[in-house]
Amino acid sequence: MAERFDRIWHNARLATMRADRPDLGEIEHGLIAARGGHIVYAGAAADFPADADAIKRIDCAGRWITPGLVDCHTHLVYGGNRAHEFELRLKGASYEEIARAGGGIVSTVAATRKASEAELVASALPRLDALIGEGATTVEIKSGYGLDAETEMRQLAAARSLGRQRPVAIRTSFLGAHALPPEADGDKDRYIDLVCKEMLPAVAKAGLADAVDTFMEGIAFSAGQTARVFETARGLGLPVKLHADQLSNLGGAALAAKFSALSADHLEHTDEAGAAAMAKAGTVAVLLPGAFYFIRETQKPPVESFRKHGVHMALASDCNPGSSPLTSLLLAMNMGATLFRMTVAECLAGVTREGAHALGVLDETGTLEAGKWCDLAIWDIERPAELVYRIGFNPLHRRVWRGQ
C-alpha cells in the first residue's frame, strides 16, 4: 500500500542547509513530503517512492525552497516611537544630549510602562508581519523595556500573544538586566538584587521565558552582576544568552562561554581568547549588522577569528527602537555580507540553521530534514545567492509554517 502524506512539494530545488552537506546542501531536483506538520522526506525526487500519495501536491515550478527563516535576536515588543531622535541625531545631537532631554532607552521604558498588553501587541504586529512577509517562521522576542517586574512580564506575555495571533513560532527571552531604571538612583547592585530575587523567579514561575539575556557593558552591567543573573537563571533551569562586547571588550564572550550560553550577541570587540572560549563551549555568535550600520560603528566583529576557531555564526535583525529599527532578515543578510564580509553560505546558514542553533531549537527547525517542523520559504529566484545579493527586493513566493 502506497504511503500517504498531507502535502508533497515537488518540482523544487532545495537548499537544505544541513550541516552534514557542503555549502547550502543543494538538491537540484528535490521534493519535500510532510505529515502532521513535520517533514517526513526532504531529498532527491528520484529517491522518493513514485506511488506515494498526498492530500495535496504542490508543483513548485522549479522554485528554490529553503528552511523558514529564523530571527534569533529581536526587541519587537515595546511602546513609543523614537523616530524623532533619529532626526535630532542627524542634526548633530549626541546620544548623551538626547538622553538628558528624556530620550533614549528611558523614553522607551516610560512608554512601555504606560502601554497595556493589548497596546504592546498592536504596535508589535506590523513589525512581526514584516518579518513573516520575508519568510520568517521562528522569531525570538526579548523583554527589557519595562525594568520592573510587572512591565517585564507584560512584555513577555505580549510576545507570547503574538505567537497565538500569527502562524509563527515565538521564543521569548527575559532581559530584565538591560539597563538601569530611573528609580534605581544609579545603584546597579540593588537593581540586580531585584532582578535575581523578584523578577526572575516570577518570570520562571509564570513560564513566560525560554531563556534569560543580559547586557554586559560599561553603560549597562558588569561581569560580576551578569554572573549573578546567570547563576540565578541556571538555578531556575533557564538557559542564558548575552549582549556581549558590543562597545568594549569586558570579557563578555568568555563569560558567556563559561556559563555555556546559547549565544553571545553583537561581539564587535571580542578578542581571540573570547572566540576560542565560545568555540569550546558551543556558544553561537549572533552578529547584528543592523545595529553596526545604524549607530555607524567602525569596529567589526572578528569573523575571521570565529572561522578559525569554528564558532557557529548566526545573523539577526536586532529589531529595536534605538539602534536597529530593522525588520528585514534579507537586508540583514546583505549587511552581513557587505559589512562583515560573510559568505553567502554563512549568511543563509545564519538566518536558518545557526539562528535555530542560537535559540536551542535546532532539533526542531532550521534545516530541511526528516523529523523537523515543516517550516519552508519558497522563493522566486534563479539561485540562492540572490537572497543575499539583492537589496530592497522580496522574492518570497510562499511561506509554509508547520506544513500549512
From Swiss-Prot:
Cofactor: Zn(2+); Fe(3+)
Cellular component GO terms held in the UniProt record: cytoplasm
Reactions catalysed, as given in the entry: 4-imidazolone-5-propanoate + H2O = N-formimidoyl-L-glutamate
Entry's localization field: Cytoplasm
E.C. code: 3.5.2.7
UniProt superkingdom: Bacteria
Coiled coil: none
Protein name, per record: Imidazolonepropionase
